[in-house]
């Protein structure tokens, strides 16, 4: 039973990584030629390394990848793109802000994965096969980078037109 739980948990996180990578590939295409595309490309490369770590861990634990979960994740990302496109058809700051927020939340989930596996490894010797502290630190560094960029974009995306108009009316 516990092995089934580990398989389910790891496959859920693998599916989440599919969503993240697809989202980043789309962002790179949408914002091609802009500095944010380079930021996303570097982040995607880092996350793909983590996906490989997760796949290697699953392989060592003899856990098969769930094609159903991966397909569902792919479909979820397509619906996410539709939602983002409807929210901001001009591919502006709102779309970028919401995408960065989704990535930030996903990276936090990955950090939680590594923390949970480290805790489980204390009582399950078969899980003592990865450097969870290093992986957690990588996730924290990625999250910090994404959060800094997300908050930068938030200043533009969530800027109130009323506050801008009020300042211009008052002569500021």
Predicted regions and their residues:
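Disorder-to-helix initiation segments
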Residues: 1-13, 36
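Acidic/histidine-rich alpha-helical segments that form the ligand environment
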Residues: 10-24, 77-124
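Short, charged, amphipathic alpha-helical segments
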Residues: 11, 37-45, 69, 101, ...
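Helix-loop segments that flank and shape redox-cofactor active sites
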Residues: 19-41, 63, 113-116
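A structural signal for long alpha-helical coiled-coils and helix-turn connectors
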Residues: 25-32, 55, 59-62, 83, ...
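Conserved alpha-helical segments that form or flank metal/cofactor-binding pockets of metalloenzymes
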Residues: 37-78
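Preference for long, well-ordered alpha-helical segments
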Residues: 103-172
């Amino acid at each position: 039973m516990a092995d089934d739980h580990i398989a389910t948990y790891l496959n859920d996180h693998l599916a989440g990584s599919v969503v993240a990578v697809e989202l980043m590939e789309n962002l790179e295409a949408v914002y091609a030629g802009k500095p944010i595309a380079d930021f996303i490309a570097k982040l995607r490369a880092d996350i793909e390394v983590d996906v490989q770590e997760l796949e290697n861990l699953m392989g060592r634990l003899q856990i098969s990848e769930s094609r159903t979960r991966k397909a569902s994740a792919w479909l979820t990302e397509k619906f996410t793109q539709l939602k983002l496109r409807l929210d901001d058809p001009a591919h502006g700051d709102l779309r970028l802000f919401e995408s960065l927020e989704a990535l930030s939340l996903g990276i936090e989930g990955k950090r939680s994965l590594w923390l949970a596996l480290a805790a489980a490894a204390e009582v399950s010797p078969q899980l003592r096969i990865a450097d969870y502290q290093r992986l957690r630190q990588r996730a924290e560094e990625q999250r910090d980078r994404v959060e800094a960029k997300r908050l930068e974009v938030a200043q533009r995306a969530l800027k109130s037109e009323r506050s801008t108009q009020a300042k211009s009316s008052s002569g500021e």
